[in-house]
Amino acid sequence: DPDSHSPTLRNYHKFLWSKKLPNGLPFKLDETIPMRLHHKSDLGEFVLSSDSIAHTYSNIKSTTNIIKEIDTKELKKFVSLCSTIGGYIIFPSERINNQMTINGARGVNKKIRDRFDLTLECIRRYYIKEDSPLNETFERYKQFFNLFESFQGYVDFFLLQDLVTNDYSSIRYFIPFETFENYPLPNDIEEYKQYK
């Protein structure tokens, strides 16, 4: 969790996401739990931490050869962009029933591989009660997702409008997506450039 090592990032998140929820109630975050953000009210208690929206995939065996073909300056620029405040989001960070967190599940799921656009597709499906590779995980965290009331509420709260169509009915994928059966990472240099 990047913010566990960066008080600055944690403070930015606290500032950005301490605001009214879609139902008009305040969602005030504090730092009463070390290295985490925290909210406690009649809405429930949530311990939250950040997760990256974009990744270079430079440490993934299947993309190593592709990344070798990317100009070093271009890759550094992408890393820098991924490291801005817009490159992170918060999720609940406490395990429920000793199961994976959202952050962990989206990272290890071979159909998602930490791609945020695919995670957002899973979130969209969750709100309209369609199955997805992360549905079981999201069900454990339904109290968190209930805060936002709908997919549009979630997107608007976290300022993710650039990643969805104007009517919120579909995702603007980083690379083409048809089904979760397809390999989720870029297959060649052209797809990688499109992804970044």
Kindly give the residue locations of the regions a language model identified.
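C-terminal, well-folded lobe of enzymatic/effector domains
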Residues: 100-196
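Context-gated lysine
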Residues: 14, 19-20, 28, 40, ...
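Short, glycine-/Ser/Thr-/acidic-enriched flexible segments
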Residues: 95-98
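Intrinsically disordered, low-complexity acidic Ser/Thr-rich regulatory segments
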Residues: 42-84, 145-152, 158, 164-168, ...
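Residues immediately within or flanking Cys/His clusters that coordinate Zn2+
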Residues: 86-89
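Hydrophobic, well-ordered secondary-structure elements that form the walls
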Residues: 92
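Intrinsically disordered, low-complexity N-proximal targeting/linker segments that flank membranes
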Residues: 1-70
